[in-house]
From Swiss-Prot:
It is found in: Secreted; Host cytoplasm; Host nucleus. Effector that is involved in host plant infection. Contributes to virulence during the early infection stage, by inhibiting plant defense responses induced by both PAMP-triggered immunity (PTI) and effector-triggered immunity (ETI). The gene is CRE18. One of its GO terms (cellular component) is extracellular region. This is RxLR effector protein CRE18. Its main location: secreted. Belongs to the RxLR effector family. The RxLR-dEER motif acts to carry the protein into the host cell cytoplasm through binding to cell surface phosphatidylinositol-3-phosphate. A motif (RxLR-dEER) lies at residues 47-68.
Length: 189
């Protein structure tokens, strides 16, 4: 019974608020549909909404340049950041990645030669009980740091391939055949 009463009360309130007499009496309150909301001919809608007083002259130059002043201030603050960003982008695009690639691949391509004695020596070191690069470095196996860095690259490639083989993914190795030929170490090598 109480649900029926509440439904009737909601319906009555809705009917009373949507009647034409109520809408006509609320006309000055409703600013969107009221006559005070209309803009004069030639005046911008934005400026009309911003006017604070009725007597304010909306055609003053300050009203026109309000947004421009704010944007100029933002540009003034952001100009150093834009310069730094442009310099960083120019620096990053000036050195092309393909010009650096041969330098980085040179040491790996040398190891890919099957007749390379260093490659064979790296294989023997890797297959020994102490194949870890840091252990071999402590033992003094490497003459130069460049030789150590080449062995570390060799070691990383071998370790990832053994991980593929031990996980049962040797037929679908994560490396491409070209990479296997270049480095000279496959999953079962």
């Amino acid at each position: 019974m109480s649900k029926l009463f509440y439904a009737f009360a909601v319906l009555a309130v809705h009917v009373l608020t949507s009647s034409p007499t109520t809408a006509a009496s609320n006309l000055p309150v409703n600013l969107v549909t009221g006559p005070a909301f209309t803009t004069p001919a030639g005046a911008a809608h934005r400026r009309f909404l911003r006017s604070i007083h009725e007597g304010e002259d909306s055609l003053k130059p300050s009203a026109f340049s309000e947004e421009r002043t704010a944007l100029r201030a933002m540009d003034y603050l952001l100009k150093p950041k834009h310069k730094k960003l442009a310099a960083a982008l120019k620096k990053s695009t000036s050195k092309h990645k393909l010009s650096v690639a041969p330098e980085k691949m040179k040491s790996i391509q040398v190891l890919g030669d099957p007749k390379n004695p260093e490659r064979e020596w790296f294989k023997r070191l890797y297959n020994s009980k102490r194949g870890d690069p840091q252990t071999l470095r402590k033992l003094g196996q490497f003459k130069t740091e460049a030789q150590l860095s080449r062995y570390i690259k060799f070691y990383v490639v071998c370790r990832t391939c053994i991980a593929c083989y031990s996980s049962g993914r040797s037929d679908s190795c994560h490396r491409t055949p070209r990479m296997v030929r270049t480095v000279g170490v496959g999953c079962r090598d």
